[in-house]
Every structure is written in structure tokens, then in C-alpha cells.
Amino acid sequence: MDNPSVTLIQRQGYQFEHHYAPGIPVLLADEPAPFGTGLGPDPVELLASAVGNCLSASLWFACQKYKDDPSPLRTEVKATVGRNDKGRNRVQGLAVDLHLGKPAAELGHIQRVLDTFEDYCTVTQSVAPAVPVTLRVLDSSGAVLKG
């Protein structure tokens, strides 16, 4: 990965277009009411998406390394937002549930994957020192494998 960049251009009010590399669709972000109109994800949702996507991709990569196929993956991220001691809103935590599309018994190297994949998630490992991230990994039967 080189040095990724994004250019934000204000459309109106709290709406910002996120322009990535050529060929990547523009993403519209917006604040929810009463500030914005809620036409796109807000910055907290984008942070949650980045953490969830990175963990999902990291788990997928680790499984592929061992020729395991956990698909289809489904990841839910819930952000906790509250006020700090100065009364400012802050993301106080991110709770991630990563659901495998298969039972653990069908994934021959799942324990090795679970022991290592988190360490390779660039976004989560960068965010976690400031925002606590809790992670659970569940198989398709709902059994908790991690967390």
C-alpha cells in the first residue's frame, strides 16, 4: 500500500463528496439531522466501516493463506458515542461482530487465523490505542470463536 489519499469537496451544508483514486466511485458523507440531511454515512459510521472492513479483509486474507473459505463474511460494527470530560462528543468504543459463513469445523486452520489476523489489520491497530475496539468472531452456527 502506498500513501492513500482522499479529497473531500463540500457539496452543501454538511454534505461532502469523498473523491478517491480515478475509477473509484465518489462517496457522499453527511451528518444526520439536525445538522445534516443524513443522505450518506456520517464520519462515525465511516470510522466504523473502516475498522470493520479492515478486520474482515484481514481475516479473509489469513483464511485464504491456508486455503480455507469462510465466505460469505458478514461484519457488524456498533459505535458507542458519548461526551468526554469537556462535554465534547467522542467515539468511546467500537464493538465488532465478525460472522463467518461456515461452521468452524469446516475451516481447518481457523484457530491459527484467529490467533493472528487482528495483528495485520492496519486500520484497527492504528485506531485501537485511542478508541477501544472489542471483537467477537462467530461461526455460521452462532458459536463464539473469539471474544
What are these regions (language model features)?
Residues 1-49, 57-147:
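Extended beta-strand/beta-hairpin segments
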